[in-house]
Amino acid sequence: PERGLAFDFLADAPAPDGSRGGGAAPATTVALPIGIKVVVAGGFGVGKTTFVSTVSEIEPMSTEELLTEVSAATDRLDGVEDKATTTVAMDFGRITLDPRHVLYLFGTPGQERFSFMWEELSEGALGAVVLADTRRLEASFPAVDFFERRAIGFLVAVNEFDDAHHYRPDEVRAALDLGPEVPVVLCDARVHTSGIEVLISLVHHLIKLRSSHVSEAV
C-alpha cells in the first residue's frame, strides 16, 4: 500500500510536456513514462558516484577524471587521501519504478569549485539525497544549506564506511543542525537494496511534505 501511495504521488509530477500525470491517456496515443528527477549531493568523496552506480538499472554515465597534483592541492582531501578520481560534471543513472514512472538520478560534483553546477543540475528536481560521511560531516553543510534555501525536499543518508565510527541518526541530526522534519537514514552506498531503501524513504518524505502543503492551503 505504501509503495502504491508513493506512485500515486509521483503520478502528479510534471511530465516532460508540462502536463500532469495520473489521468487516462487518450486511446489513440501511447502513454510516455513520466521522468522524476532526484539529485544526489554531498561533499567530496562521500560515495555519490558509488550510490548512483549501485542503484541504476542502466550503465551509469559518469564524468570521473583522475585527480592531478594541481586539483589535489585545490580540493580538500582530508579523510579521502586514497581517492584517485573525482566527478567533474555529474553522474547519471535511471530506475524504472513502474511502466509509467522513471526515476532519473543526477549526482553532483562534490568539490566547492564545481558548486556552480548544482543550480543547473537541481533545476526541476522533485527531491534530493544528501550523502554524508561521519568522518567529515562538515563536508555536508554546503549541500544541506543549498537545498534548504531552495525549499527542495531532501533527506540525509549517512554512508557507513567500514573504518568510520557509527553514530545514531539523532546524533547526526544534531551535528548537522537539521530540523525534525528532515529524515536521517543509514545506508551502505555499495549495496543495491540499501540504496533503494534510501530512495523509498525520500519518496515517503516528499509525500508528507506535499500533504502538509495541501493541508496548509485548505
Where do the protein language model's features map onto the residues?
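Conserved C-terminal guanine-recognition region of P-loop GTPase G domains, centered on the G4
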Residues: 131-181
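Short secondary-structure boundary/capping elements
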Residues: 87, 109-114, 135-139, 167
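Conserved G1/Walker A P-loop phosphate-binding module
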Residues: 2-80, 94-98, 102-104
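Canonical P-loop GTPase G-domain recognition
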Residues: 162-218
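Conserved catalytic network of the ASCE P-loop NTPase/AAA+ motor domain
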Residues: 31, 87, 96-99, 119-124, ...
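Conserved beta-strand segments of the P-loop GTPase G domain that flank and frequently precede/overlap
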Residues: 105-108, 128-133, 156-160, 186-188
